[in-house]
Swiss-Prot record:
Active-site residues, Swiss-Prot/TrEMBL: C134 (acyl-thioester intermediate), H248 (proton acceptor)
Keywords: Amino-acid biosynthesis, Diaminopimelate biosynthesis, Lysine biosynthesis, Methionine biosynthesis, NADP, Oxidoreductase, Threonine biosynthesis
Annotated protein name in UniProt: Aspartate-semialdehyde dehydrogenase
One Gene Ontology molecular-function label: protein dimerization activity
Length: 343
């Protein structure tokens, strides 16, 4: 039985921080204690874990010295990780970082446990393990087993990303915009989190535009997929924010070196870890955001061959990005790290 771990959660009052507590409980992770950390404005508030209340403390440079911990989950933004992760590492903890700050650093493993758990062994180089972007995680969980079988050479993906990808503020803004719509005042609504009103709308921009006219979010999917799969894979992404509260959806087109047997591809995906196939289009059965919200799996459907090219496969992929795309993946990393540590 694994030794119980002292856990710190940086960003404990945010959407991912709150979900981390739920997932740690559900996956029965061996927890001795919880140290919830946040900014000064949240100090004094409480979070609950397994029926016990823990007071939120302020994140400072000395808090990890004063409160020794084993694992620190960081989910409070890249600038916070940049400033404070080193203090957790110096105190002897492993940092599992949910932000984008460390992902592409050479010596920091970028891990999806279903795809590249072997990379966790490199954590000692920096004391940090990076959690990939939410939209990347669900995609590579599907790509990995198919790549192993058919040798993937290119991926084209269009995402349909929920408001909660922008945190609690994103969810709240969508709800308020819909309330404005039902009050016949949507034209008066002023968005703060998104560049435009999201209610009844689609926004083909997530994060800032780069010099090549791709957004930062789109390039994350390109670069992170290549790093996780250890393959110089061609990836092109178009990321769109949609008026859905929770769960990201993706339409994925995969180009392979070999001809695809769709029946075999479905069987491979049915056996893939953390993947659930819902694919019965004649009976209108396929994954959707509402059915996948608050779950820990990646759902796949609409699996079909290309009409023109036998080396191309199309599918539809949906997952709760707060869980699969952040909290659940982070806890699964911690589980694998603990297994490795105990060997």
């Amino acid at each position: 039985m694994s030794k119980k771990q002292k856990i710190a959660i940086v960003g404990a009052t945010g959407a991912v921080g709150e979900e981390l507590l739920n997932v740690l409980d559900e996956l029965d992770f061996p927890v001795e204690s919880i140290l919830p950390l946040a900014s000064a404005k949240s100090v004094g508030s409480e979070v609950e874990f397994k029926g016990k209340a823990y007071k939120v403390k302020e994140l400072t440079e000395n808090v990890f010295k004063e409160n020794p911990i084993d694992i620190a989950f960081f989910s409070a933004g890249g600038s916070v990780s940049e400033k404070y992760a080193k203090f957790a590492v110096e105190s002897g903890a492993v940092v599992i970082d949910n932000t984008s700050h460390f992902r592409m650093e050479k010596d920091v493993p970028l891990v999806v446990p279903e795809c590249n758990p072997e990379d966790i062994k490199d954590w000692k180089k920096t004391g940090i393990i990076a959690n990939p972007n939410c939209s990347t995680i669900q995609m590579v969980q599907v790509l990995k087993p198919l790549n192993d079988a058919f040798n993937l050479k290119r991926v084209d993906v269009s995402t349909y990303q929920a408001a909660s990808g922008a945190g609690k503020e994103g969810m709240q803004e969508l709800v308020e915009a819909m309330q404005s719509f039902f009050a016949f005042k949507l034209d008066e609504f002023e968005p703060q989190t998104f560049p435009y009103t999201l209610a009844l709308n689609l926004i083909p921009q997530i994060d800032v535009f780069m010099d090549n006219d791709y957004t930062k979010e789109e390039l994350k999917m390109v670069n992170e997929t290549q790093k996780i799969l250890h393959k110089n894979l061609e990836v092109s992404a178009t990321c769109v924010r949609v008026p859905v509260l929770r769960s990201h959806s993706e339409a994925i087109t995969m180009h392979f070196e070999k001809e695809i047997d769709v029946k075999k591809a479905k069987e491979i995906l049915k056996k893939a870890p953390s993947v659930i196939v819902i694919d019965d289009p004649k009976n209108k059965k396929y994954p959707m955001p509402l059915m996948t919200s608050d779950t820990n799996e990646t759902y796949v459907g609409r699996i079909r061959a290309d009409v023109y090219d036998k080396k191309i496969l199309h599918l539809w992929c949906v997952a709760d990005q707060i869980r699969v795309g952040a909290a659940t993946n982070a806890v699964r990393i911690a589980q694998k790290w603990l297994e490795l540590k105990n060997k």
